[in-house]
Amino acid sequence: DWFYKDGGASLFWPEKWKEFVETIPKNEQSNIIKAYHKRLFHKSKEIREKFSIFWLKWENSLASMQKSINNYTPPINYALAFSRIENHYFFNKGFLGSDDYILSNAKKIDKIPGIIIQGRYDMVCPPNSANKLKNVWPKSELKIIDFSGHAMSEPEISRELIKATEKFKN
């Protein structure tokens, strides 16, 4: 709801949200994931490609604090693969039973240690989501990374991911 409905991330990037939704008919804008699914899996290659770029531009606009990433237009093959895979999962609610499935089932991993790495300025997955997970996963450690967004390419996020991997490699 935060990322694909008006009133969440769209409040921070209204001009990018407008670009993302304006090509979708008004009567379909209440369910952007479904509307994009229809177009990303359309029989017309031209329509699939056009909407895969729109999808990725919205994602990239909010994924990083680095301007170079925000203005990047990827190769069409990447845009198609990324947007279709991501949309397919979202369209199918991540193949989970409910929106709160992970939080409701955290007890299944409560004895397993883990590190949650979260950008302070993540506009894709807001920090309160990571905090909610930390609150139900006692063996987890939450690292909020200041001056970072969502993307793995953010320098501090990358560093923390490597440190976390090193910690658990043995």
Question: Positions of the model-derived regions?
Answer:
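Catalytic active-site module of serine/aspartate enzymes centered on a nucleophile-bearing elbow/loop
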Residues: 140-170
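Small-residue-rich helix-loop
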Residues: 70-80
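Accessory cap/linker subdomain of secreted extracellular hydrolases
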Residues: 34-70
